[in-house]
Amino acid sequence: MATPTPTVKIGFIGPAFNNAFTLDSATNGRLDNTDYVLGGTEILVDLTSRTTSLRVKRGRKDFTQPFRTGTATLILRNIDGELDPLNTSSIYYPGVTVGRTVTIDCNGQSIYNGTITNIELGYTVNGDAWVVVRAADGLGDLATREITDGTAFTAQKSGERVTAVLTNAGVNFQGTSAINAGLSDLAAETLSSATNARSYLRKVINSEQGYLYGNRSGVLTFENRYGPLADTNKATFSDDGSDIAYQRIDRRVATTELFNQLSANRTSQDPVLVNNTSSQDSYGIRNLNLGEVLVLDNSTVTDLLDLMLVKTASTETRIAEITAVLDTLSGSDITAIAQLELVDKVTVEFTPPGTSQQIAASSIESIEHNFSFGTTWRCTLGLIPQIVTSYLVLDNATLGQLDNNSLGF
């Protein structure tokens, strides 16, 4: 067994962290140096020794919804008052502030990169004091930006539309991004009013049935709908000691995920409906409206809905979550878990009571890390069967099963 080691860093700008180029300064004013730059930049400071707990949440719990903003919550010890913005003698003055970078590593592997959105300072009359830091990734940043009124988009692939939104003057996304070209062809359109960037991008994602998320290193990532299909197995979890051990597995089937009639509409057009009549005969009609999609024609809308229907009409029991306790694992297994990303493929081996061992190929829908100093580090992965996230693949034992996967488009 190995001990998972966190590293928590927060960006600071202040007198003690001044790296701005300064004229007539013997230190900061040297030409041709790379340490002091115009305007200065934030400097990441290691606050691991002050951290009492951390929580990271990324992904989604409901596969019918877009990925949520990835968040992190840190609790920092502040008994000496060094993190208080009123403490002008502190090396950290003017203290932790919003908009600064937060990075969290586990055993040297990045598990979160975002910016501070909220700071709470508290203390007791007995002398205890702390700072709660909350952060959000790039998706949260997009929620505060608007695409400018009158923006004209040309007919283009979904990935090109994502890039056009990010580079729009009203959005001006400054973070790092990795945008796939996409597969869906989107119609040209001109926006009649300023439009929230994240809301519009969700229409693009619906039109692709792809994935948009901030990855563990803070890169805003767009993947097309083939993402899980092209992935190789990143980790195998087992209950027999042969692979990465997990402590708990949760399997479920829920009516909140059961939909056998799906609808969506192109801009200013009537809705298109698709039905799974077999499921409707058993459970009645359960409708899910995917809203507006930006594709060129109704036949493509039908294809998108048929793909989604493969996921939503199933009533088979599926693995919803597995939880691993990192303190019980080897160093290599801890690293393997820390490196996992949303949409990654993993394999889970499990043995329900009264049955033989089962093997499930799954895609990661959510990742949650919880750690408090003095206790164990737990990582919970939200999963969905890969058989309902991918296309039919001939001669493939998992993805080649009839009546499960969808023909590609």
How should these model regions be labeled?
Residues 143, 162-192:
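N-terminal export/assembly leaders
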Residues 59-89, 179-228, 234-409:
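An acidic/polar, Gly/Ser/Thr-rich interaction patch typically located in mid-to-C-terminal regions
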Residues 160-168, 303-310:
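Charged/polar, solvent-exposed surface patches and flexible loops
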Residues 1-154, 188-194, 198-209, 243-247, ...:
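Assembly/oligomerization scaffold segments
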Residues 96-97, 125, 136-140, 154-159, ...:
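Short, surface-exposed linear patches
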Residues 10, 106, 165-170, 205-208, ...:
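Hydrophobic, Leu/Ile/Phe/Ala-enriched alpha-helical segments that form helix-helix packing faces
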Residues 23, 102-103, 153-167, 288, ...:
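Short, cationic low-complexity segments
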Residues 127, 131, 158-161, 260, ...:
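Alpha-helical structural motif
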